[in-house]
Amino acid sequence: MRRRRYLEKLEWVEREINFATEHAMSDEVRKRAVLYSIMTAVEVVMDIVAMLVKDLGKQVEDDYTNISKLLEECVIEESEAELLRRYNGLRNAIAHHYNHLDLSKVERALTQLDELYEVAVKLVKTADKLAG
């Protein structure tokens, strides 16, 4: 059951990333759709992070603390933790429209979504190993 939830979340991340990378932000509607897909993909990755923290027997806290816990447990490397933190910050900026969202940061983030997906895959594989 838990494994299925991880896989469902991973499929959701893949679907949102594919949408975001396949559509240009050529008008306001498409821009909003792409931003929503990025935001959703990151949120689902953070769900995976929280699920894994729980499966490691740790207390689930805020996203940044959960990322740090995975780093402390040697589940992820510092570069992966930094990637997760950056995307979580971008998600927050999109969700709350901080500082009139810098679209150049979004464009850069679009080019690295495959890296975010690879980290998500790694987390799901780690969870699979824990389940034995």
UniProtKB/Swiss-Prot annotation:
Its EC number is 3.1.-.-
Q: Which InterPro entries does this chain map to?
A: HepT-like, HepT-like_sf, Type_VII_TA_RNase
Q: What does the record give as the active site?
A: R91, H96
Keywords attached to this Swiss-Prot or TrEMBL record, sorted alphabetically, are: Hydrolase, Nuclease, Nucleotide-binding, Phosphoprotein, Toxin-antitoxin system
GO cellular component terms given for this protein: toxin-antitoxin complex
Could you describe the post-translational modifications of this protein?
A: Modified by cognate antitoxin AF_0948; probably at least 2 successive AMPylation events occur on Tyr-98.
Superkingdom assignment: Archaea
Q: Where is this motif: RX(4)HXY motif?
A: 91-98
Q: Which residues carry the post-translational modification O-di-AMP-tyrosine, per the record? A: Y98
A GO molecular-function descriptor: RNA nuclease activity
- Which enzyme class? hydrolase
Q: What does this protein do?
A: Probable toxic component of a putative type VII toxin-antitoxin (TA) system, probably an RNase. Probably neutralized by cognate antitoxin AF_0948. Neutralization may be due to AMPylation by AF_0948.
Q: Which family does it belong to?
A: Belongs to the HepT RNase toxin family.
Q: What is annotated about its quaternary structure and interactions?
A: Homodimer, probably forms a complex with cognate antitoxin AF_0948.
Q: What is this protein called?
A: Putative RNase AF_0947
Q: What species does this protein belong to?
A: Archaeoglobus fulgidus (strain ATCC 49558 / DSM 4304 / JCM 9628 / NBRC 100126 / VC-16)
